[in-house]
Amino acid sequence: MVILDGKLVSKQIKQTLKKQIDTYLNKNYKKPKLAVILIGNDPASELYVSNKIKACNLVGIESVLLRFGQNITSEMLSDQINQLNNDNSVDAILLQLPLPKHLDEQEFLQAIDPLKDVDGFHYINQGKMLEGYDTIYPCTPIGIINLLKAYNIDVRSKDITIIGTSNIVGKPLAIMLSNMGATISMCNKNTKSLKKYTKRSDIVISTTGKQALIKKDMIKKNAIVIDVGIIKDPITNKIVGDVDFENVKELCSYITPVPGGVGPMTVSMLLENTFKLYKLHIKENYEN
């Protein structure tokens, strides 16, 4: 059994990225810049944003955090996004989710300029992804794919079950893996026999946030298991995932830990997406 060490791979990605950014800075180009919009004071969102900003600093990406209270109006948020869209110093915009209930997430995700859409949630970027074109990909799905690639795991012709159908992870991941030649089964809360799908799969990817959902008897021998769940165990207060790790790992050929698996990859892909958008803007503003 091999641990898919997202922390290690993420560190390597960040080291490479810093060198690439330094190359641009040595040519007197401006720094890449990420603008982060954080609404309210949700502890999980605060932690995620803090980690993202620290990661930006490590690789030489400038970041600006724009904080707003829980009661921000739609008009105020729309105005702020428009300002960032029109600010040539900003290469990428991150709207930290979830938003308060009175704000329509899709409305504001679609308001972000697709050429500044660091999360890859804009319909234009998702349409390109659907058609198999190079684009800005959602961070967690592309992080999972790059983690598999780092361990030379080829998904072509693999039977893959994805549990969870969110627009952030499950759906885009299914499209991307399908475009790479995998056979995909998608399961949700209405799936009658989850075990029927997972037991036959070469790769099982769980994205539900339900502790210990995936148990040993649901996995075939030498399967690859990817755990996207992040849950605080109410008894131990430790961070755990969807997978009963200690028991499931006995059967796996590869498995991601929680923490230290998919999470670090998501952050490093945010950095890569920011740099990708930066390069587009450099080409547009400096080289044309």
From Swiss-Prot:
Protein name, entry field: Bifunctional protein FolD
GO biological process, one term: tetrahydrofolate interconversion
Cross-referenced Gene3D superfamilies: Leucine Dehydrogenase, chain A, domain 1, NAD(P)-binding Rossmann-like Domain
Pfam families attached to this UniProt entry: THF_DHG_CYH (PF00763), THF_DHG_CYH_C (PF02882)
Task of the protein: Catalyzes the oxidation of 5,10-methylenetetrahydrofolate to 5,10-methenyltetrahydrofolate and then the hydrolysis of 5,10-methenyltetrahydrofolate to 10-formyltetrahydrofolate.
Coiled-coil intervals, chain numbering: none
EC number assigned by the record: 1.5.1.5, 3.5.4.9
Keywords assigned by UniProt, alphabetized: Amino-acid biosynthesis, Histidine biosynthesis, Hydrolase, Methionine biosynthesis, Multifunctional enzyme, NADP, One-carbon metabolism, Oxidoreductase, Purine biosynthesis
Keyword tRNA processing recorded: no
Reaction equation(s) it catalyzes: (6R)-5,10-methylene-5,6,7,8-tetrahydrofolate + NADP(+) = (6R)-5,10-methenyltetrahydrofolate + NADPH; (6R)-5,10-methenyltetrahydrofolate + H2O = (6R)-10-formyltetrahydrofolate + H(+)
